[in-house]
Amino acid sequence: MTIESRQKGVAKTARNPVKIAPQSTDQLLRKPSWIRVRSSNSQEFYEVKRILREQKLHTVCEEASCPNIGECFGKGTATFMILGDLCTRRCPFCDVAHGRPRPPDPEEPLHLAQSIAAMKLKYVVITSVDRDDLRDGGAQHFVDCIREVRAHSPQTKIEILVPDFRGRLDIALEKLFACPPDVMNHNLETVPRLYRQCRPGADYTHSLRLLKEFKARFPGIPTKSGLMLGLGETDEEILDVMRDLRKHDVEMLTIGQYLQPSIGHLPVMRYVTPGAFKEFERAAIEMGFSNAACGPMVRSSYHADQQAHEAGIIQR
């Protein structure tokens, strides 16, 4: 595979250990009435896109085909995706392209900081593709971005949504310790039984260790994780994962509905009702999470500023 070759859908997941059975459209579960996506046609939406293209930046909103892009861009917010738009993993739930990425762009931290300053954002989420090709998994680039954003917008709070730094955890954490964020987020995504199918190359206990070790070093910085429902898990398995997160000192939680980006991705096994999401939210608070956002359209960075406000991280 050459640098910049892009694989999506069936081509991306063809080498995964658990294959996705071909589906016709009549085999797909019908979306229920509570799954609604806002249209993308406001002036703010196009202004955000203009700034992103001028600064040659990527967002997970676009690359992962997030259903909330219309609402978030329409409000003038975005979740910035650094380190390129090609991921070294092949997760079959995700619409980000797989490929061999280019080296990190040394100008990206500055472009990111300038964009955030231009958008006058009080709260930003910075995420990345997986970069298994880099010795530190991209951790230094996260640090460079945090420093530039703080230099240009010292009042802006920064949440980072990091990959698992597989095989590079100690190096990555050492880098992050030099310039930590205001919120540390790493998604478990699903239950351990489904990791081989849903997160090939990832390890459940490794992800928990990442969250635990960061929290041990910075007890005053909130840690956060997210889960998707509809991949074949049971309610009790989700509750078990929530308990594991609390055992590893994670304080903030997001749970949302998995939506299949294309027929080349994992199918939706169930649509969870809004009432059931409310029950997970209630259970999360009872377990001791300081904040839990649970709902069909919730994503890890969706309304992250609101969640941070409710957790007392930012003031409005």
From Swiss-Prot:
InterPro entries: Aldolase_TIM, Elp3/MiaA/NifB-like_rSAM, LIAS_N, Lipoyl_synth, rSAM. Binds 2 [4Fe-4S] clusters per subunit. One cluster is coordinated with 3 cysteines and an exchangeable S-adenosyl-L-methionine. It is found in: Cytoplasm. Pfam families: LIAS_N, Radical_SAM. It is an enzyme of class 2 (transferase). [4Fe-4S] cluster 1 binds at C61, C66, C72, S301. Gene3D superfamilies: Aldolase class I. GO terms for molecular function: 4 iron, 4 sulfur cluster binding; lipoate synthase activity; metal ion binding. [4Fe-4S] cluster 2 binds at C87, C91, C94. It catalyses: [[Fe-S] cluster scaffold protein carrying a second [4Fe-4S](2+) cluster] + N(6)-octanoyl-L-lysyl-[protein] + 2 oxidized [2Fe-2S]-[ferredoxin] + 2 S-adenosyl-L-methionine + 4 H(+) = [[Fe-S] cluster scaffold protein] + N(6)-[(R)-dihydrolipoyl]-L-lysyl-[protein] + 4 Fe(3+) + 2 hydrogen sulfide + 2 5'-deoxyadenosine + 2 L-methionine + 2 reduced [2Fe-2S]-[ferredoxin]. Its main location: cytoplasm. Residues 73-290 form the Radical SAM core domain. The keyword Iron-sulfur applies. CDD domains: Radical_SAM (cd01335). Keywords: 4Fe-4S, Cytoplasm, Iron, Iron-sulfur, Metal-binding, S-adenosyl-L-methionine, Transferase. SMART domains: Elp3. GO terms for cellular component: cytoplasm. Its cofactor is [4Fe-4S] cluster. Its EC number is 2.8.1.8. NCBIfam families: lipA (TIGR00510), PRK05481.1 (NF004019), PRK12928.1 (NF009544). PANTHER family: LIPOYL SYNTHASE (PTHR10949), LIPOYL SYNTHASE, MITOCHONDRIAL (PTHR10949:SF0). Belongs to the radical SAM superfamily. Lipoyl synthase family. This is Lipoyl synthase. The lineage of its organism: Bacteria, Pseudomonadati, Pseudomonadota, Betaproteobacteria, Nitrosomonadales. The gene is lipA.
